[in-house]
A protein has these predicted regions:
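Alpha-helical transmembrane segments of multi-pass small-molecule/ion transporters
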Residues: 1-314
Length: 314
């Protein structure tokens, strides 16, 4: 019973914040313009500030774990390849690009940081998980949506240039890079700067979760039910079953294991829908997968955490 209570305490507050976002939109406190701006604020300001504070204030030499970062990178890359092969039977009826992106791309930054902080009181190894996944997420999302788009057979130079520029200027990646440099050089942070950054950083989790909930829409599920269900099962179950045993075998525990779980088995991020639409896909499969995985992950993540707690790994 104690293990179940631990799991519920870890997951319910996170999803309640998302539910609050949905409620606030429903009653008119959040409108579409505000939700868009809130998402942008979290992505451009609050989350980079959180990552900078977390990494910059740590001893990077002690915190860095090459094996863990490579594990996160490798598991993500293999997830993308598996998603591609599983998508082949559905390619006549749905966008392969949407299927692959929705199957592998998690809400790693927002939900990952929220879960680790909620359980351990700090952000622990979630930052290292983000280093191993977010750059690859962004690169491969553009590649699969471009190459696996109906009528598209190759990546153009302009598209690749735009992708590289997007990665270099990604605020989350910039926050990580500046934090790493700050930590490596052991630069002292003035009290005023530290408190200002901290105040911005604490906004990332609650605002990010509420923005995700507010952006959530019940659409797209009635079409393409079978591929949506397959995609969702892969996202919430299959990748966890395939790759978590390797994480345990490699000796990862506590915040590293929780961050890996979020990377593998959390809901498909809402930004997948935005990106799919912006690259010429209809977005229906993505919207349906976001809806189903968001609802399902409230139960699946609780279950996985319960299993890990019973094994005394978290």
């Amino acid at each position: 019973m104690d293990n179940l209570i631990f799991s519920l305490n870890a997951t319910i507050p996170v999803f309640l914040m998302m539910v609050l976002g949905m409620i606030f939109r429903k009653i008119g406190l959040f409108d579409e313009a505000f939700i868009t701006k809130m998402n942008k604020f979290v992505f451009v300001v609050a989350l980079p500030a959180l990552l900078f504070e977390d990494i910059g204030s740590a001893n990077f030499y002690e915190a860095w774990d090459t094996t863990y970062v490579l594990y996160c990178f490798g598991a993500t890359l293999l997830s993308i390849l598996i998603s591609f092969f599983i998508s082949i039977p559905f390619r006549k009826n749905v966008s392969q690009g949407e299927f692959v992106q929705a199957a592998y791309r998690s809400s790693a930054a927002i939900i990952g940081m929220a879960f680790v902080q909620n359980i351990y009181g700090d952000y622990g190894m979630a930052s290292l998980m983000i280093i191993g996944t977010v750059p690859l997420y962004n690169v491969m999302a553009v590649v699969v949506l471009a190459l696996l788009k109906p009528g598209q057979s190759r990546l153009t130079f302009a598209l690749m240039k735009k992708t590289i520029k997007g990665i270099i200027t990604n605020p989350i990646i910039l926050g990580i890079v500046v934090g790493v440099i700050w930590s490596l050089l052991k630069i002292p942070t003035p009290v005023i700067v530290h408190k200002t950054v901290s105040l911005l950083a604490v906004l990332a989790t609650p605002m990010g979760l509420m923005a995700m909930g507010a952006a959530f829409k019940f659409q797209g599920f009635s079409q393409n039910i079978k591929p949506i269900i397959v995609c969702s099962v892969m996202k919430l179950v299959v990748f966890v079953v395939l790759f978590m045993p390797f994480a345990i075998y490699l000796g990862f525990t506590e915040s590293k294991l929780v961050a890996a779980l979020i990377m593998l088995g959390s809901a498909t991020t809402v930004s997948c829908y935005i990106m799919a639409r912006s690259m010429g896909h209809d977005g229906n499969l993505t919207a349906g997968t976001v809806m189903l995985t968001t609802l399902g992950s409230a139960f699946s993540l609780t279950f996985w955490l319960y299993i890990l707690k019973c094994l005394n790994l978290v």
